Amino acid sequence: MKHLLLLTLSALLYCWVSADTRCHSCYKVPVLGCVDRQSCRLEPGHKCLTTNVYLGKMWVFSNLRCGTPEEPCREVFNETNHKLGLNYNTTCCDKDNCNSPAPRPTPALALISLTSLAGLGLWLLH
């Protein structure tokens, strides 16, 4: 009887913890970082995923999202799309926000970058 009670409590605790697991969801691109950043709730039995896409050795973009019954997370390393010449790496994780994107770019950093580019443009015009 003790074992049945312990098993039931463990199952309830697992369902309660996994029901609140969240993943980041966005398309991450160079310079801009995560575009359309959101959060999704992970369904029980599924995992967060991050797919990194490369052209040769150059990173092109990443797709962060929750795995779903229609598109579950399947880890893949160096899968190649021969028509486009792209390589894909997909990793899976099941902790809260484990597929963490890079921090959002700060407005100050963007302002410094734009000011530097404007200064360079003016210098080139002289």
UniProtKB/Swiss-Prot annotation:
InterPro entries: LY6_UPA_recep-like, LY6G6C, Snake_toxin-like_sf. It is found in: Cell membrane. The keyword Amino-acid biosynthesis does not apply. Highly expressed at the leading edges of cells, on filopodia. Coiled coil: none annotated. Disulfide bonds join C23-C48, C26-C34, C40-C66, C93-C98. Residues 1-19 form the signal peptide. This is Lymphocyte antigen 6 complex locus protein G6c. One of its GO terms (molecular function) is identical protein binding. A lipid is attached at S100 (GPI-anchor amidated serine). It comes from Mus musculus. Residues 101-126 form a propeptide. It is a lipid-anchor; GPI-anchor. Monomer. Keywords: Cell membrane, Disulfide bond, Glycoprotein, GPI-anchor, Lipoprotein, Membrane, Signal. Its main location: membrane. PANTHER family: LYMPHOCYTE ANTIGEN 6 COMPLEX LOCUS PROTEIN G6C (PTHR32149:SF2).
